[in-house]
């Protein structure tokens, strides 16, 4: 059965997906913002906790070392003090999972137990997930190879059990009994019923109701897809042969640094210059070579593939299609979209067609402007065709910049701004605390308590933000522990002879699971406290505080959007907590956070002493004239993803390159370049097969939410509270269409049908063309 990955980031294409993984503070009176004289918005002053973020995170730590005398283990698990502990905990967890599985299988013998099946399935999922997610984090961040290897071993063993549970006929049969019983179904809360249906749908996707031979084929095909996908991902970054550039084509390079050096090299050797795709030289030539032929050669070299690379991709696509046909679906897209907001490929097509129709005029206008630049440069007849290799030369990509002048933003300053923003919106702030010796895996790692003004500490964030050898690249939000209600677990009912045979292993597993539990003021029962890790690769400062580039500030806001979703989405079932929601909904909170950086009022929060700010909106300070071209290119990629995962993948003679060329011929604005095959570098085809539209989709919704809900008063507690109550608090425990419909007061969206998808497509261009351009 399939579950939401713990790492929520679009680039996490290599991550497996699982379903069966699967302290109180003083109470404060709620804060309220107010508007003072016209044009000014009153801002809550920075608190001591806010200012402490700056001093703690901006203090030099380059020489800091972890204590050799640990008093606790990772994430305050007292038993996780040594790599071997991961193996012991994994073994104990597997035993307990086996016992709980047997209990669920026996539930058909007891009506009382049938009422507990959904809860126990979620417990089983969480029991395994909690260890898998910890191991996943260790695999990607720990500097000690012994820890990484131990995490890998534990991870693989637990995943094997997951795969067995994914196709467990007995569990499926018990759940079928539960969902066929009107009395039991009526007793389930909406959140519990949604959890049950998630398990049911994932079982159905796993060929659970097919004969044994077909189930074996399903497992074999699934394993083959994973293997092909890994090989495909390796090839997406494989070196391509160099472009050979004659010295004469390097004349007039606009770059006076590297360009001059290349010209001198070519003059000295009198040989063709070999330029490797992806290199700094290749990027420089695409941006600054007046000679079109030089750019054409680099472009073709950068988008070339070997026959073997193309064949590998097409094997992966056809194997996915065979898997879908095995379970009775027309295509892999139909199978993948069944539990998404989009529901089916037809609805995705409506969204993308609507998006294309609205985006095309703006992209054409931008291309016409580039054509005029090309005409002036080459002295051609009017409006020469813009080719794929012209884009960066006539409109060089620029790094994103803040919409208004700002002082240098240190990491601590940005965290202070985020804390102040969360206080305005949700009555929540960030409080730095010193980790106990042994609690973190590197001296760079900081610990933050997430503090609610009424409920005290509601979660923990560990921030590991500086690049280092062996650490995963990119930025990501890892969910290490999910919210879940635990006081009604009925652990006593798990008693089994097996647990008495391995008391030490069972004890370790139970102690591991018990960490982070406690009451929540205002709610009945006991809950697991969510714990997330923020991994980034910001440049480590050689001296003083880390100063962030604007794109890094945007990244931090994005990832903290995921973190707040995890903190506020305190559900009773871990399978729907926080970011455990559909792929085409999970990016909404994180993308929405980026929009706040377009507000003067929010930007003023980076100044510790600010108490007021102009409420005047920021205009199009630096609108990128080519932004619409890039947006259209993203829509084309999403359309290509749908084509590749359609029934066409099983047609005789399926040719992925021909499909790419045909898409460009029918809907593209820049001509396809014969001989190129970019699709072999489109890594998201593996990790986000048939769902690449999701990022565009959530961008569209976030744009509308910002425009209609937040833009006029981005620091309003009333508005923030409405967003928290209508969206964030549910995690994945409610239909996303119902959440969006309620938030936007648009009841026509609630059904989430094809027309709703088309409506969202129309939002995209209406909002985005007015936003400052970002590359």
Curated annotation (Swiss-Prot):
It is found in: Mitochondrion matrix. Its main location: mitochondrion. Residues 1-28 form a transit peptide. One of its GO terms (biological process) is protein processing involved in protein targeting to mitochondrion. Binds 1 zinc ion. GO terms for molecular function: metal ion binding; metalloendopeptidase activity. InterPro entries: M3A_MIP, MetalloPept_cat_dom_sf, Neurolysin/TOP_dom2, Pept_M3A_M3B, Pept_M3A_M3B_dom. Disulfide bonds: none annotated. Cleaves proteins, imported into the mitochondrion, to their mature size. While most mitochondrial precursor proteins are processed to the mature form in one step by mitochondrial processing peptidase (MPP), the sequential cleavage by MIP of an octapeptide after initial processing by MPP is a required step for a subgroup of nuclear-encoded precursor proteins destined for the matrix or the inner membrane. This is Mitochondrial intermediate peptidase. The gene is OCT1.
């Amino acid at each position: 059965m399939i579950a939401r990955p713990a790492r929520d980031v679009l680039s996490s294409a290599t991550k497996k997906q699982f379903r069966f993984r699967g302290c109180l503070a003083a109470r404060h009176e709620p804060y309220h913002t107010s508007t003072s004289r016209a044009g000014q918005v009153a801002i809550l002053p920075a608190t001591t906790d806010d200012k402490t973020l700056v001093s703690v995170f901006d203090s030099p730590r380059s020489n800091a070392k972890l204590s050799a005398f640990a008093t606790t283990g990772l994430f305050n698990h007292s038993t996780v003090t040594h790599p071997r502990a991961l193996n012991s905990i994994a073994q104990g967890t597997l035993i307990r999972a086996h016992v709980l599985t047997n209990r669920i299988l026996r539930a058909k013998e007891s009506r009382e137990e049938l009422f507990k099946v959904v809860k126990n399935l979620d417990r089983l999922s969480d029991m395994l997930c909690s260890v898998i997610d910890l191991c996943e984090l260790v695999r990607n961040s720990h500097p000690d190879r012994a820890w990484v290897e131990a995490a890998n071993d534990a991870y693989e063993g637990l995943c094997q059990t997951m795969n067995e549970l994914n196709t467990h006929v007995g569990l499926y049969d018990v759940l079928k009994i539960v969902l066929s019983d009107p009395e039991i179904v009526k007793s389930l809360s909406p959140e519990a019923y949604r959890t049950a249906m998630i398990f049911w749908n994932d079982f159905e996707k796993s060929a659970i109701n097919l004969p044994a031979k077909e189930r074996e084929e399903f497992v074999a095909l699934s394993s083959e897809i994973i293997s092909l996908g890994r090989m495909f991902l390796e090839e997406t970054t494989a070196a391509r042969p160099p472009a050979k550039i004659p010295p004469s084509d390097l004349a007039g390079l606009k770059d006076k640094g590297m360009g001059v050096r290349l010209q001198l090299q070519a003059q000295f050797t009198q040989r063709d210059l070999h330029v490797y795709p992806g290199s700094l030289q290749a990027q420089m030539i695409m941006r600054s070579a007046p000679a079109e032929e030089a750019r054409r050669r680099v472009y073709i070299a950068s988008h070339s593939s070997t026959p073997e690379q193309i064949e590998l991709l097409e094997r992966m696509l056809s194997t996915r299609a065979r898997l879908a046909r095995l379970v009775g679906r027309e295509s892999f897209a139909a199978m993948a979209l069944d539990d998404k907001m989009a529901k089916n490929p037809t609805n995705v097509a409506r969204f993308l067609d609507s998006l294309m129709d609205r985006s095309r005029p703006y992209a054409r206008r931008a291309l016409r402007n580039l054509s005029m630049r090309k005409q002036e440069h080459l002295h051609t007849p009017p409006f020469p065709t813009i080719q794929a290799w012209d884009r960066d030369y006539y409109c060089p990509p620029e790094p994103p910049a803040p919409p208004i002048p700002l002082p240098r933003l240190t990491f601590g300053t940005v965290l202070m701004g985020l804390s102040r923003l969360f206080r305005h919106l949700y009555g929540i702030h960030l409080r730095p605390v010193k980790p106990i010796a042994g609690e973190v895996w590197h001296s760079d790692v900081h610990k933050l308590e997430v503090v609610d003004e009424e409920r005290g500490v509601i979660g923990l964030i560990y921030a590991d933000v500086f690049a280092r050898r062996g650490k995963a690249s990119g930025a990501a939000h890892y969910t290490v522990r999910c919210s879940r209600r635990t006081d009604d677990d009925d652990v006593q009912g798990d008693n089994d002879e097996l647990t008495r045979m391995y008391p030490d292993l069972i004890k370790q597993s139970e102690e591991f699971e018990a960490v982070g539990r406690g009451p929540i003021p205002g709610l009945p029962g006991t809950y697991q406290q969510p714990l997330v890790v923020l991994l980034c690769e910001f440049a480590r400062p050689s001296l003083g505080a880390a100063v962030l580039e604007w794109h890094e500030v945007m990244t931090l806001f994005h990832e903290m959007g995921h973190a707040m979703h995890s903190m506020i989405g305190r559900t009773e079932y871990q399978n729907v907590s926080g970011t455990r929601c559909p792929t085409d909904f999970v990016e909404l909170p994180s993308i929405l956070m980026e929009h706040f950086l377009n507000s003067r009022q929010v930007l003023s929060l980076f100044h510790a002493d600010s108490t007021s700010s102009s409420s005047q909106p920021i205009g199009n300070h630096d609108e990128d004239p080519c932004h619409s071209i890039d947006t259209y290119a993203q829509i084309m990629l999403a359309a290509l993803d749908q084509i590749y995962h359609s029934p066409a993948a099983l047609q005789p003679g399926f040719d992925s390159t021909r499909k790419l060329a045909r898409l460009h011929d029918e809907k593209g604005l820049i001509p396809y370049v014969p001989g190129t095959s970019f699709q072999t570098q489109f890594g998201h085809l593996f990790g986000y097969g048939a769902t690449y539209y999701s990022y565009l989709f959530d961008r569209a919704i976030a744009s509308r939410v910002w425009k209609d809900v937040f833009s006029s008063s981005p620091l309003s507690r009333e508005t923030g509270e409405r967003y928290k109550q209508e969206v964030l608090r549910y995690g994945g425990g409610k239909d996303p269409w119902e959440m969006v419909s309620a938030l936007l007061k648009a009841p026509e969206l609630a059904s989430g049908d094809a027309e709703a998808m088309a409506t969202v497509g129309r939002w995209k261009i209406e909002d985005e063309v007015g936003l400052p351009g970002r590359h």
